[in-house]
């Protein structure tokens, strides 16, 4: 029997977002007080992200017969991330050149007050490439889980899973125990997900109440350019990759619509990470590939953040009438390819990454970030949405490359018939 429409999660989330926008617009002071609802939901999700990643990766690797496969999957994923990330960076640059959202502002850089962005600049300067790599190694195993550091947890899980795979049957008891814990954790996620409408309402009410719809008007062209470019990236770039792999990007987006609406309401792609991993497994991707690609992608495959970075830098240059040579723009691309790897799926990380990029391109004043500080919160939704779609597509693609994609289950899931028997599915 089909659920009444008002009991469907994505309908509830849409309604919550609309109510949040209305409350923020009509009663801003009250709406700002709703912030704990959004923060609380994200904290509940983040509470289980670390353990889920650990358990999923460990059981996936422990079940692999060939340990060389772990390195092969990781290598293919990183190669895919670099290629697609470069496309995203170039597309952001090209779209800003064509649509020129910053032209006409004629702002004197000397009049900009950089104090408002000083904290972001300080965070950006605080970590070099070596620091980033060293940060992947945790001080202790417990510390990695306590701090919720995804890459550190991933490293521990890789080592743990590798040892279990080497032990074989001697490690079967531990593997089965961790597999049971995984089921419990996903059960917790199902319970927490029911609170998604509350979280989306609180986060959206706070955003509109604090920043106001009026703050969007002067920079609507930049916002429109960014959203349009992100849509083009998903439909054209990711769409072409999806078609080549054998599935429809439109149907895939429809398949993860609940996760996308949670991200839209919270502006954090991490808020939907556990649900996305579960959905990808149900769509025919092997657990081992999902466990390796999705967590890694949250640091190395942020397509929306990549588009935003090159677009924001060029917008500031246009708004302050600074001409960038082609060599400077190529330098910008190279720098952005490195700095973007330090971004995570948490709200606000994109702005810190932008500060890191500008710090290495001194031609453009760091104080220019103040021009987009007020609208960054509204652009973060689009960044997070593009990021999660990009990571989902990446997982399906790498699964196909590894011949670990159950195409029958994939097509059944994307067509809305998720009850296809896994045993009838053909491995490709």
Curated annotation (Swiss-Prot):
Location of this chain's protein in the cell: Cell inner membrane
GO MF annotation terms: fumarate transmembrane transporter activity; malate:proton symporter activity; succinate transmembrane transporter activity
PROSITE patterns hit by this protein: NA_DICARBOXYL_SYMP_1 (PS00713), NA_DICARBOXYL_SYMP_2 (PS00714)
Main location: membrane
Keywords associated with the record: Cell inner membrane, Cell membrane, Membrane, Symport, Transmembrane, Transmembrane helix, Transport
Keyword Cell membrane listed: yes
GO biological process, one term: L-aspartate transmembrane transport
GO CC annotation: plasma membrane
NCBIfam families, alphabetized: PRK01663.1, PRK13027.1
Identification of the protein by name: C4-dicarboxylate transport protein
Organism of origin: Burkholderia thailandensis (strain ATCC 700388 / DSM 13276 / CCUG 48851 / CIP 106301 / E264)
């Amino acid at each position: 029997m089909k659920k009444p429409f008002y009991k469907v999660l994505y309908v509830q989330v849409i309604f919550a977002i609309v109510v949040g926008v209305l409350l923020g617009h009509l009663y801003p002071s009250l709406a700002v007080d709703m912030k704990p609802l959004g923060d609380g939901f994200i904290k509940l999700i983040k509470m289980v992200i670390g353990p889920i990643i650990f358990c999923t990766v460990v059981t996936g690797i422990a079940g692999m017969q060939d340990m060389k496969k772990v390195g092969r999957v990781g290598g293919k994923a990183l190669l895919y991330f670099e290629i697609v990330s470069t496309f995203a960076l170039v597309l952001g640059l090209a779209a800003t050149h064509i649509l020129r959202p910053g032209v006409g502002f004629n702002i004197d850089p000397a009049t900009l007050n950089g104090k408002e962005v000083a904290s972001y600049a300080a965070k950006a300067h605080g970590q070099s490439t070596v620091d980033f790599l060293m940060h992947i190694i945790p001080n202790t195993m417990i510390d990695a889980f306590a701090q919720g550091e995804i890459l550190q947890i991933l490293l521990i899980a890789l080592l743990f899973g590798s040892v279990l795979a080497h032990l074989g049957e001697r490690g079967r008891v531990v593997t089965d125990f961790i597999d049971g814990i995984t089921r419990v954790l996903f059960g917790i996620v199902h319970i927490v997900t029911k609170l998604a409408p509350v979280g989306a309402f609180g986060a959206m009410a706070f955003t509109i109440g604090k920043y106001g719809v009026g703050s969007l008007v002067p920079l609507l062209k930049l916002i429109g350019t960014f959203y349009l470019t992100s849509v083009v990236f998903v439909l054209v770039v990711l769409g072409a990759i999806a078609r080549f792999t054998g599935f429809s990007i439109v149907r895939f987006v429809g398949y993860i619509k609940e996760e996308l609406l949670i991200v839209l309401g919270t502006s954090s792609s991490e808020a939907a990470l556990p649900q996305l991993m579960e959905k990808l497994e149900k769509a025919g991707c092997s657990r081992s590939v999902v466990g390796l690609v999705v967590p890694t992608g949250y640091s190395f495959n942020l397509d929306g953040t990549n588009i935003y970075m090159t677009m924001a830098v060029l917008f500031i240059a246009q708004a302050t009438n600074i001409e960038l040579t082609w060599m400077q723009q190529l330098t910008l691309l190279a720098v952005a390819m490195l700095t973007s790897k330090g971004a995570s799926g948490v709200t606000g990380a994109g702005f810190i990454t932008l500060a890191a990029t500008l710090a290495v391109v001194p031609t453009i004043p760091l104080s220019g970030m103040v021009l987009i500080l007020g609208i960054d919160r509204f652009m973060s939704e689009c960044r997070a949405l593009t990021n999660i779609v990009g990571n989902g597509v990446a997982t399906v693609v790498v699964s196909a490359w590894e011949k670990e994609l159950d195409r029958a289950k994939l097509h059944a899931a994307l067509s809305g018939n998720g009850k296809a028997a896994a045993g009838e599915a053909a491995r490709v």
